[in-house]
Amino acid sequence: MTDCIFCKIVEGKIPSRKLYEDDDMLAFHDINPLAPVHFMIIPKKHVDSLAHVGPEHVEVLGKMMAKAGALAREAGSAEGFRTIVNTGRIARQDVYHLHIHILFPGQANH
């Protein structure tokens, strides 16, 4: 999508503080964190929201969830973390590119 801010981050047109990147997904720090540690994981291929996920997205979503735990542990989440996916306007989804928020009240190591 040409006007999607997350697609522009994937394309390198907008800078981000990256935590992880591979061929399918990107993880980066939230620019307006709601906790001392707050980052997001997005699929590189545009999907509007969790409501638009189909069978073709199962593999990347599984990888994203597995990476969420690994990145949270690397950032110091020994006690646990929150995983949030806002879906649609009523749920306060602000950017219509599927993203998983990972946050916890710890000290950021990145």
Where are the model-predicted features located?
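HIT superfamily nucleotide-processing domains
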Residues: M1-H110
